[in-house]
Design a protein with these regions (language model features):
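N-terminal, Lys/Arg- and Ser/Thr-rich interaction peptides
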Residues: 1-16
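Long, charged N-terminal interaction/targeting segments
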Residues: 10, 17-157
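Short, flexible, mixed-charge glycine/proline-rich loop motifs
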Residues: 152-163, 183-184
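Short cysteine-rich clusters marking metal-coordination/redox-active sites
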Residues: 166-170
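Zinc-coordinating Cys/His ligand positions in small cysteine/histidine-rich zinc-finger domains
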Residues: 174, 190-193
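Short Cys/His-rich "knuckle" micro-motifs
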Residues: 176-179, 203-204
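Short linker/helix segments within small regulatory modules
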Residues: 179-188
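Short metal-binding segments enriched for Cys and/or His
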Residues: 193-210
Length: 210
């Protein structure tokens, strides 16, 4: 569901740093760690386990890298490119989160941690994969199929009224003390993360202005 490619310029990160960055890029906890408004909330553990099982990260070190119209050498500042492939319908909603977490993880490995925020030495591309182009378990898996895979661990809770569907992404969310929720006009909405909540509220506000 999320395939990540990390391209590293010569001398940018040593082998230990590459392994550390790859592990962090492929960790569900890191993906949500940027959102202070989530109140420490993490994706429901059983859904998170399913989500994590779909992560794959590959690291490349190209022998030739040109940036700013010149060939980079080991003496140049580190350059990194991250390509994150996600289901097409999720690309818009996930882009800001993905760009933030990938940049943060790489910046923490640089001697100058402010560099990626001052110069375009780290670029992140979020690429939406067309529906039907993701294959898992020997068959095409569309966005709705992935939503149901993430929701499957909480079907019993939903039947018992202890889980609600996130109105933005459609994933079942168990109602826990730390669940991100919003009460609007007496109706309770639950969200898998703070990002879904914020986007939902923004869409409601926009609809209200219309």
């Amino acid at each position: 569901m999320m395939f990540i490619e990390l391209f590293v310029s010569e001398g940018a990160l040593d082998s230990a740093q590459q392994r550390r960055v790859a592990r962090r890029l492929g960790t569900i906890h890191e993906l949500g760690a940027h959102d202070p408004e989530a109140g420490g909330h993490a994706m429901a553990p059983r859904s998170a386990a399913v989500f994590a099982s779909m992560f794959q990260v590959v690291v490349h070190r190209p022998p030739v890298w040109v940036a700013g119209e010149r060939l980079l050498t080991e003496e140049d500042p580190p350059h990194c490119l991250v390509r994150v492939f996600v289901p097409g319908p999720w690309r818009k909603d996930m882009s800001e989160t993905v760009i933030s977490y990938a940049t943060r993880i790489l910046a923490e490995e640089f001697e100058d941690r402010d560099l990626p925020y001052q110069r375009p030495t780290v670029q992140v591309q979020v690429i939406g994969i067309s529906e039907g182009s993701v294959g898992m378990l020997g068959k095409a898996a569309r966005s709705q199929d992935l939503v149901e895979m993430l929701s499957a661990p909480y079907q019993e809770e939903a039947a018992a009224g202890r889980a609600l569907r996130d109105p933005l992404c459609g994933v079942l969310v168990p109602l826990r003390d730390d669940t991100v929720t919003v009460d609007l006009d007496g109706e309770l909405f639950a969200f898998c993360c703070g990002g879904c909540r914020n986007e939902f509220l923004a869409e409601r506000a926009e609809a209200g202005r219309g």
